[in-house]
């Protein structure tokens, strides 16, 4: 069976991930006119730029959908977001600022939950608005086929007939108007935005040029912290975790993770926390650039990692970072449910996250500027009395340290011999300043 259909399968049911925007509206109407039977599925991901979810399925019915459903994906999305925080599943960082993989997390949820809903309706052909140059086309492909083994893929944006007739937004708008729908294009921004309640992605158009900075972006989850005219008073916030799960903000306990994430977004958003500018490698290895918002994820991540460093030992922390980066890359590639990802997730959640219990107090200022004011946990292995510089009882004596240092003589001797061996082989050069062979300075090479 052919998995990807290049032309519209007339007379068959086609499920379309329907956002209500111009692209999917025109595609749905066009498919109905060409003889297909479109079913519309809209994911409620708590998008911060969407204020009336119930209106979206109604519009789909007006444009010719056989049926239209709104699927509430918020609970599952937040669950996956918390799992990503527990695992440190983030691999794109620049200058210490992190991209929290909020779009890949959203695709993992919509790519499974929408296809599962389609399967309930006997719909085994799926279309969405992802382009052939991006990451989402592969993410949706993988998650869709994982969920429904009989699934076939039809994307109007890969159909030459659709492209020839409605190849641009102007043509789509004219098509909608000609069909009796007073659909006007929204005001064109200098970039495109995709969002869910975990974060927002701003990319393309002017942002493809690296001389266009974050300053052209209008945040939808935060504030323009770079604009000095925007008043942002400092704010003290506490975050509490129990066994790796965020449970309270500023002393208020949440039984609903969705409400907790919304409040974390509000707190972090007041400061522009979690905004970053990243150059990344797409799945196809080409580089792209995005500006990201994730105020709630950033707030929880900072508190989680503060507790992590006070609770776990050095090797565990090192593996958390190493495995987290591996897992983040798998998540980015649309492999969040693959066996290699599940293996990493299980270890990180079982042996790392389970011990993260405690409370962190921070002072948030502008953007990603913050201070940690206090860290409290019954599980802390940080114990100041062990290494206090003040006189008093100690867990080890000066003689103990002398013995430990004496044992270092063995590897110090070995290292010295290796350095002079490298010098003899011409790999290092003598240094009168240090008395040890060293790597030749780059500025001295070729002189």
Curated annotation (Swiss-Prot):
| Binding locations of L-citrulline | 99, 135, 139, 192, 201, 203, 280
Give the transmembrane ranges: none
Q: Which reaction does it catalyse?
A: L-citrulline + L-aspartate + ATP = 2-(N(omega)-L-arginino)succinate + AMP + diphosphate + H(+)
Instruction: List the subcellular locations.
Output: Cytoplasm
* Gene for this chain: argG
Q: Which GO terms describe its biological process?
A: argininosuccinate metabolic process; L-arginine biosynthetic process; urea cycle
Its predominant location is cytoplasm
Task: Please tell me one Gene Ontology term that the record gives under cellular component.
Answer: cytoplasm
For this protein, the record's CDD domains field holds: ASS
This protein's assembly is summarised as: Homotetramer.
Question: What protein am I looking at?
Answer: Argininosuccinate synthase
* Enzyme Commission number: 6.3.4.5
- Give the organism the record lists: Salmonella heidelberg (strain SL476)
Give the matching InterPro entries.
Arg_succ_synth_type2_subfam, Arginosuc_syn_C, Arginosuc_syn_N, Arginosuc_synth, Arginosuc_synth_CS, Arginosuc_synth_type_1_subfam, AS_cat/multimer_dom_body, AS_multimer_C_tail
Question: What positions does the entry give for L-aspartate binding?
Answer: 131, 135-136
| Homology family | Belongs to the argininosuccinate synthase family. Type 2 subfamily.
For molecular function, the Gene Ontology terms on record are: argininosuccinate synthase activity; ATP binding; protein homodimerization activity
């Amino acid at each position: 069976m052919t998995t990807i259909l290049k032309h519209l399968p007339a007379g068959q049911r086609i499920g379309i991930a329907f956002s209500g925007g111009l692209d999917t509206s025109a595609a749905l109407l066009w498919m109905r006119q060409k003889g297909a039977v479109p079913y519309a599925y809209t994911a409620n991901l708590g998008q911060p730029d969407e204020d009336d979810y119930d209106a979206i399925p109604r519009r789909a019915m007006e444009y010719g959908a056989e049926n239209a459903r709104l699927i509430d994906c918020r609970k599952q999305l937040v669950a996956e977001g918390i799992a990503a925080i527990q695992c440190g599943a983030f691999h794109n960082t620049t200058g210490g600022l992190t991209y929290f993989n909020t779009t890949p997390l959203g695709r993992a949820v919509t790519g499974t939950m929408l296809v599962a809903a389609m399967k309930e309706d006997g719909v085994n052909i799926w279309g969405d608005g992802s382009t052939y140059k991006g990451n989402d086309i592969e993410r949706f492909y993988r998650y869709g086929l994982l969920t429904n083994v009989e699934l076939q893929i039809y994307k109007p944006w890969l159909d030459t007939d659709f492209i020839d007739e409605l190849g641009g937004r102007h043509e789509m708008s004219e098509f909608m108007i000609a069909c009796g729908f007073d659909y006007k294009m929204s005001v064109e921004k200098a970039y495109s935005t995709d969002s869910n309640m975990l974060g927002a992605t701003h990319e393309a158009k002017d942002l493809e040029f690296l001389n266009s900075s974050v300053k052209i972006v209008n945040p939808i989850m935060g504030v323009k912290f770079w604009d000095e005219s925007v008043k942002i008073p400092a704010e003290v916030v506490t975050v509490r975790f129990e066994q790796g799960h965020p449970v309270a903000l500023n002393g208020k306990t949440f039984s609903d993770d969705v409400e907790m994430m919304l409040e974390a977004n509000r707190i972090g958003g007041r400061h522009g926390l979690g905004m970053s500018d990243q150059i990344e490698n797409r799945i196809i290895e080409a580089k792209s650039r995005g500006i990201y918002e994730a105020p709630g994820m950033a707030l929880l991540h900072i508190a989680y990692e503060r507790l992590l460093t006070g609770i776990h030992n050095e090797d565990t922390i090192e593996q958390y970072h190493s495995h987290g980066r591996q897992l983040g890359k798998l998540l980015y590639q649309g492999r969040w449910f693959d066996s290699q990802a599940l293996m990493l997730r299980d270890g990180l959640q079982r042996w790392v996250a389970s011990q993260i219990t405690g409370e962190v107090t921070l002072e948030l200022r502008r953007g990603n500027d913050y201070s940690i004011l206090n860290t409290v946990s019954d599980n802390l292995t940080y114990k100041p009395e062990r290494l206090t510089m003040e006189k008093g009882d100690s867990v080890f004596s000066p003689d103990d340290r002398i013995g430990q240092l004496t044992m270092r003589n063995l590897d110090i001797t070995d290292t010295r011999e290796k350095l002079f061996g490298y010098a003899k082989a011409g790999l290092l050069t003598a240094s009168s300043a240090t008395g040890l062979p060293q790597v030749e300075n780059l500025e001295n090479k070729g002189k």
